[in-house]
Amino acid sequence: MINLAVVFLIIAVIAALLGVTGVAGMAAEMAWILFVIGIVLAIVFWVLGRRPPPM
């Protein structure tokens, strides 16, 4: 998930350098969304992984 966020961030930077601001904004927003989802999932799995298995 974080890998996709990095890819979209790179696309956003390249698009911004080329002057395509619409694509840059959209790619940056997608990178931010994927980054937040990745962090939230990492925290959820970290918390759930610490519980003992149900009996």
Swiss-Prot record:
Transmembrane spans: 4-24, 28-48
Presence of keyword Transcription: no
Membrane topology recorded in Swiss-Prot or TrEMBL: Multi-pass membrane protein
InterPro entries according to UniProt: DUF1328
Assigned keywords, A-Z: Cell membrane, Membrane, Transmembrane, Transmembrane helix
Pfam families for this protein: DUF1328
Amino-acid biosynthesis is among the record's keywords: no
A GO cellular component annotation in the UniProt record: plasma membrane
Localization of this protein: Cell membrane
Family: Belongs to the UPF0391 family.
NCBIfam families, per the entry: PRK13682.1-4 (NF010229)
Protein name: UPF0391 membrane protein Neut_2351/Neut_2360
